Each structure stands twice: as structure tokens, then as C-alpha cells.
């Protein structure tokens, strides 16, 4: 029987790219995108979009299907078309499964609490 998880951590790579007057943002590990007028707004809008996606997956009982990486050609297109200033950020999304709805918290720089299981088992 699988062990019931209380908290799960999802490591996320955010790509933030200047496209004309806007900033586009992409969470690579979950194939969720957003945008904003500034880099900071694009980051916050992406966090909100990722949180909505993960909450929906958890509430639908599809926790194991949350990770769905952006296809390689999608990454290449995001990075190169059109060319623009690009920033890469690393975050961890901490999901507490004991609450309904689940509670989510973004941690910077790949921080993961010691009592939290990774979302994807190491190979």
C-alpha cells in the first residue's frame, strides 16, 4: 500500500522573458504559462496560475499527474521566438495535503523542508 503523503514539494523552474512591452512566464515542470507588465508581475501571475492548476489536480485526485513537463520544442520556442531578455528562477511549491482545499506555499531557491517528500521519486 502506498504511504499517504501529508506534504509534497514540487521543484519548479520559472522562465521569465521580455517580449515587447510584456513579460512572458513559464513553469517548465508543469507546462503552465502566464504574463505580466513587469518581470515581478509575470512571476506572481505564474505562481497564481500554477497554484490554481495544482489545486485543481489535487482536488481531482490526480496528484500523481501534476508533473507534465513542457515539451522540448515548446521550450525552444519560448526561449527563442521572439528573442528577448531571459531570466531563470528556481522555486519549490510546497503543497499541504491535509487541508481542504490544499494549502500551497512557494519557497525560493529550491528550499525543501526536511519533513516533506519530493513529488517525484529519485531514480
Residue ranges and their predicted role:
Residues 30-41:
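A short, exposed loop/beta-hairpin motif centered on an aromatic-Gly-Thr core
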Amino acid at each position: 500500500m502506498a504511504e499517504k503523503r501529508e506534504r509534497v514539494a514540487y521543484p519548479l523552474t520559472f522562465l521569465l522573458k521580455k517580449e515587447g512591452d510584456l513579460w512572458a512566464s513559464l513553469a517548465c515542470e508543469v507546462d503552465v504559462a502566464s504574463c505580466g507588465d513587469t518581470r515581478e508581475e509575470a512571476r506572481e501571475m505564474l505562481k497564481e496560475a500554477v497554484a490554481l492548476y495544482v489545486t485543481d489536480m489535487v482536488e481531482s485526485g490526480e496528484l500523481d499527474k501534476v508533473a507534465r513537463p513542457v515539451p522540448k520544442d515548446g521550450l525552444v520556442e519560448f526561449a527563442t521566438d521572439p528573442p528577448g531578455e531571459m531570466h531563470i528562477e528556481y522555486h519549490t511549491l510546497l503543497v499541504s495535503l491535509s487541508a481542504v482545499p490544499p494549502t500551497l506555499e512557494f519557497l525560493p531557491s529550491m528550499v525543501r523542508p526536511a519533513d516533506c517528500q519530493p513529488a517525484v521519486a529519485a531514480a
